[in-house]
Design a protein with these regions (language model features):
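N-terminal hydrophobic/helix-forming segments and targeting peptides
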Residues: 1-423
Length: 423
């Protein structure tokens, strides 16, 4: 557990944005012999049995079976690389009351008050006119300052945050020659490119405070981006430790843009996974109706963080089903299919946990508190394959700094490994 906690903490530090996360996954996989594949060229029999492909902030990796047969299917683990944050707008510097601020908008369902009074950096990707993509990351340069109660007595009872008026981070005292491009110019300097080369950017705030273990028994981990780097890291560890597969193809995919609906070229609602599976099916010799049958023999575990019962808000949870941190990953169920789990998928998950010797817990919502959704229903409906939704339990989901248990990440990694390795 200490080694795993140290590893996921470093993974979070290395992954301030989805683009960095995809590269961090690739770097780890290459150390285990996985080879990069270019999706802009036709795939043929030269595609490596252990390979990966990156599309923007998403990555898909695979381990093909040594002996494909008429029983072969895909065993897929899906997660997502993005988290709520503030995203830099064009002309990203704005002046207010003698302060230089970052002109930003909210990305995803951020718990907005959690971003107040925290030092943040900027990270993401810059594109230049020659088509090159440059990852960039700054140190702590900004802070969204909360108003003092002496100036707003109502803040104690009813904190209201207007996204335009109250959420912009400050970066400096404004000088006489402030340009609306000051932030972009600074990012170019950090990336080592000339500002006149910059064409566009996808840049987000990220919390510079590193993860930390805490608690009376050092059993909790506080960190940014646990939703959903906790699942990405568990899937990565499971794939790193997979020696090989005999019959089924193991596929790991970490999508981007789940927090904003998944409807992009690198999101679960786009064709990324379908494109990868189509290419791998052809490489294994499954074409035409053979590919359809291959998908019919396949399954998917959608791994996305869920909720532990909250000690201060117990009434918001189901009165009977009360999952806790460090008691095993969650099997997520919803009658409206906001989670994709059904009886068949639930059995797949329970069998993997049993094989791994891992405890698992059920999660359902209070009937009066509708739940969110995941990539699970999107994947199931796009591909027509059995899909089950799981994930570790968190408190403070969508906060700038969430918390989980140090036991649950290793549990999830072991269960995912068993799902791939089970004969």
């Amino acid at each position: 557990v200490p080694d795993y906690t140290q590893a996921i903490s470093q993974f979070v530090v290395d992954s301030p944005t989805s683009y960095h996360a995809a590269q961090a996954v690739a770097a780890r996989l290459e150390k285990r012999g996985f080879k990069a594949v270019d999706e802009t060229v036709a795939w043929d029999s030269s595609i490596p049995a252990r390979g990966y492909v990156i599309r923007d902030g998403a990555i898909a990796a695979w381990c093909l079976p040594s002996a494909p047969s008429e029983r072969t299917g895909f065993r897929i683990v899906g997660a997502h690389t993005d988290s709520p944050a503030l995203k830099l707008k064009p002309q990203g510097a704005i002046v207010r009351e003698g302060w230089e601020m970052i002109n930003a908008e909210i990305y995803g369902g951020a718990l907005e008050n959690s971003w107040l009074d925290r030092e943040v950096g900027l990270a993401g990707r810059l594109t230049t006119y020659d088509g090159a993509v440059h990852l960039v990351r700054t140190g702590p340069i900004a802070r969204t300052a909360q108003v003092a109660p002496h100036l707003d007595r109502s803040a104690h009872e009813n904190l209201h945050l207007d996204r335009q008026a109250h959420m912009l981070p400050l970066t400096a005292l404004a000088g006489e020659a402030v340009s609306c491009h000051d932030i972009e110019n600074y990012l170019c300097e950090q990336a080592g490119i000339s500002p006149d080369q910059l064409a566009f950017h996808d840049v987000f705030t990220y919390l510079v405070q590193p993860p930390s273990v805490f608690g009376l028994h050092q059993e909790f981990l506080a960190s940014s981006r646990l939703d959903n780097l906790s699942s990405v890291h568990a899937g990565l560890v499971a794939l790193e430790n997979l020696a090989g597969t005999e019959n089924d193809a193991a596929v790991f995919v970490a999508f981007d843009h789940e927090e904003v609906g998944s409807g992009t070229r690198s999101g679960a609602g786009g064709p990324f996974l379908q494109d990868v599976l189509h290419g791998l099916a052809a490489v294994m010799g499954f074409v035409g109706d053979g590919e359809r049958a291959l998908l019919a023999r396949s399954s998917c575990i959608s791994a996305d963080a869920g909720h532990s019962v909250h000690p201060n808000y117990g009434q918001l949870h189901d009165p009977q089903v009360r999952p806790l941190i460090n008691h095993g990953p969650l099997l997520k169920i919803n009658a409206r299919q906001r989670y994709a789990t059904d009886a068949v998928g639930g059995a797949i998950w329970k069998r993997a946990c049993k094989a791994a010797g891992v405890p698992t817990q059920d999660f359902v919502s209070n009937n009066s508190v509708p739940c969110g959704t995941t990539i699970g229903p999107i994947t199931a409906s796009r591909l027509g394959i059995t899909t089950v939704d799981v994930g570790i339990a968190l408190l403070s989901m969508h906060s700038a700094r969430e918390m989980c248990g140090v036991e649950d990440g290793p549990y999830l990694a072991r269960a995912l490994h068993a799902y791939w390795a089970e004969n």
